[in-house]
Amino acid sequence: MLLKNKTAIITGCNRGIGKAILETFANNGADVFACVRKETEGFSEDIRILSQRTGVSITPVYFDFVEKDQVYGGIKTIISSKKRIDVLVNNAGIASGSLFQMTPLHELKNVFEINYFSQILFMQGISRYMSRSKAGSIVNIASTSGLIGESGTMSYGSSKAALIYATKTIASELGKFNIRVNAIAPSVTRTDMYDQMDEKARNKLIESSALKRPCEPVEVANVALFLA
């Protein structure tokens, strides 16, 4: 029970890596604000069962990361609970794959809006609240695409590169409040997006990885638990 009596916020936790982090944190005793874009019957049932099994509180918070006002609304909902926030995991994001010369500007802007700008906005609001407690941990889910230039990943990779750089800068600023800020950069991971990838592209990514296999969501979740 590494997170017993702690409260975490996890964004984009209805599937894939985010869902694995939600389950791992709940299994380790954390109460969770589970932030997703919209309510679905399946997600509501999943968190009800998980909460019942683990005995922790899981509070859904619904907002669209593209809409600035909704992001502010999500922050307000969480802060109004008056709970101390110990951990924030920024996992919400979208994938995008297209060659540089074929990438329209609106696509690039949309990817950055969700993968970068909304993450910054959310971190600003939550970190101000964390600062009052003089403690906390922020974990950003980035990607190896933000570290290694790969054909067809200009939009996605550059948004994750920006998030990685921001993580370093924010860490240097929030350290005085005893808030740690880290990023995890997984390689290709077995999620629904992985299943939708072109087989040739998927195999190329697997071949470039050290273990010659996709990463499992729970492996990323365990790293997030360590950093929490």
Tell me what each language-model feature is.
Residues T7, N14-R15:
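Conserved glycine-rich cofactor-binding loop
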Residues N28-E45:
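Conserved glycine-rich Rossmann-like NAD(P)H-binding loop of the short-chain dehydrogenase/reductase
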Residues L99-F100, E107-F112, Y194, L205:
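Substrate-binding pocket helix/loop in short-chain dehydrogenase/reductase
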Residues M123, S159, T167:
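Active-site helix of classical SDR
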Residues R128, S172-K176:
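Alpha-helical segment proximal to the catalytic Tyr-Lys
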Residues S143:
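Residue(s) in the substrate-gating loop at a strand-loop-helix junction
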Residues A183, L205-A228:
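C-terminal helical subdomain
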